[in-house]
Amino acid sequence: MIFEAHDYIPISSEAQRNIANLEQAYSAWLDTARSMHELPASMYWAQKNGADYLVAKLSAKDNGTAQGPRNAQTEQQHAQYLDEKQRLQARIAQQENILTERVALYKTRLFRLPQMIDLIGTILRQLDIEELLGIDVMVVGTNAFSAYELACGVRFPTGNEATEDFDLTWCRKTKAALTFNAGLTTRQQRKSLFAVLREIDPSYKINRSKPYQAINDKQYEVELLAAPSVHPLPKAEAFAPMYSLFEQESLLLGRPVSCVLATVSGKACPLVVPDPRFMALHKLWLSRKPERKSSKKDKDQRQGYVLLDAVRHFLSSSHPLNMDFVLDLPEDLRLIFDVWCKERHFVPVS
């Protein structure tokens, strides 16, 4: 199964400009959304023992914390809070209007660009606001392939079939996470993945028979995978991924890819996914895994070949298949890569 450059459908230059404009608009919106998130949910005066006290609620569910009795300092604190909140609300409203316009252009039927289902988009936006996306977790599985298409500037002939499965892999304090650390506040007390899911939908619960999986009342599943090297996870994390997923290790290597695409209903959706070279070889490895369900093996193989060939044709500058890459490969993946090279008469350059 060999894919040549002409087997892929080019994304037009106009569509690529719209993709870049959407990413720019989303980045501006995200900065404001994070600033809004840092503010208390509300700040108000409450009476206690006949005196006014300033109370701040960090979230809607918070009982509130007294900031002190009414005086010049707390009145100034309250006024500054109201001014900042009003300023950010005005800015984010303007940015959301721009985002709506950019998403509409992205979704132009002529371009036929990949789209994400709405629930996944909601989860990923919130993970991005909370500074978990790309820092603690990356998207893996079929949902990652939309990012690879945008990175390559083409639509794949196969491999990006619609799916409602949602898999994440843990990447905190790994080489992959370093790519996205720059410029973040990296709050000392960030929420856990499970806490973010519960904030979106309180019906999410950890599946007792599969503790690496959270499931809501509508039976939508979110799974967290983790390589042995990242265990144990933080105590605050309710997920309990299996310790034996050695194949996840390779997804923490190389240079991850990030992008922004549209959801079906017209929202922006960020994606951070593993290095496409390692994801492709990971998929080919899965297609050879004896315990793997036979129904999944064919899809794994198609995805692995179409992605690695796409890297060969379109990502030689950013993700070269050179000797440096070969030397970074674990032995089991190097054997698969050697076979792939022989089939294509491909010789990695120094």
What are the functions of these language-model segments?
Residues 1-53, 61, 66-350:
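Compositionally biased terminal segments of proteins
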